[in-house]
Regions:
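The conserved Walker
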Residues: 12
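Conserved lysine of the Walker
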Residues: 16
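Hydrophobic positions on the alpha1 helix immediately C-terminal to the Walker A/P-loop
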Residues: 19
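Short beta-strand-centered segment that lines the nucleotide-binding/catalytic pocket of NTP-utilizing
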Residues: 31-53
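Conserved nucleotide-sensing/catalytic segment adjacent to the nucleotide-binding pocket
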Residues: 41, 50-98
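ATP-dependent NMP and nucleoside kinases share a basic, alpha-helical "lid"
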Residues: 102-154
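NTP-dependent small-molecule kinase module
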Residues: 109-110, 150-153, 172-213
């Protein structure tokens, strides 16, 4: 089977990661019902933030990480095409606490399905050209902010104040400039505020025909 690349896009805190995890598990279960093996790889767009090692921590902290230029989409496109050709890649590792790339990278083997997850995927024509299916997870920005505060303070070493400041200074403006318009490129729009199982079922229903095409 030719590998399929599926994008899970949407604003930060909309539920992309939850959908990605649930979808991966659901697809594996579905394949097992038919006694098929199905390999799935997950590629996070966040891993492709440009290195900011040349800047101090204070300088990095005030950068606009929500603009497409903050990400190396050229490298992401390259890696997705390599994976589609069933070639292994080494993806960067991003450190949220230090706001830059780690010195190490992560080896990723090719798979039948590549789930690429990130906010700005559908805003980039070069990324859209690699996709077999695109999903946009939509949620109210107030909900996204609440979820982001919990996630970033508990998992990413951020303070609540810094999360609020970043949200109002860059996240919200960049959402309206880049993310909201990109929803027109989605093959499927899913609510990130409803039952996660319903979201997984809806996405799975669109993906399954690709596996027998």
């Amino acid at each position: 089977m030719q590998p399929k690349v599926i994008a899970i896009a949407g604003p930060s805190g909309s539920g992309k990661s939850l959908l990605t995890r649930g979808l991966k598990a659901a697809l594996v279960r579905e394949a097992q019902l038919f006694e098929r093996e199905l390999s799935i790889a997950v590629v996070p767009e966040d891993a492709y933030y440009h290195s900011q090692a040349h800047l101090t921590l204070e300088e990095r902290a005030v950068l606009n990480f929500d603009h497409p230029d903050a990400l190396d989409h050229e490298l992401l496109e390259h890696d997705l095409r390599q994976l589609k050709a069933r070639k292994a890649v080494n993806i960067p590792i991003y450190d949220y606490a230090s706001h830059t790339r780690d010195l190490c990278s992560e080896a990723l083997q090719p798979a039948d399905i590549i789930l690429v997850e990130g906010c700005l995927l559908l805003s980039q024509a070069r990324i859209r050209a690699t996709l077999d299916l695109s999903v946009f997870v939509k949620a109210d920005l107030a909900v996204c902010l609440q979820r982001r505060v919990v996630r970033d303070t508990q998992e990413r070493g951020r303070t609540e104040e810094s999360v609020h400041t970043q949200f109002e200074s860059t996240v919200r403006p960049m959402y309206h400039a880049f993310l909201a318009p990109s929803i027109t490129h989605a093959d499927l729009v899913i609510s990130g505020e409803e039952d996660p199982e319903l979201a997984v079922s809806a996405a799975k229903a669109r993906i399954m025909p690709l596996l027998i095409a």
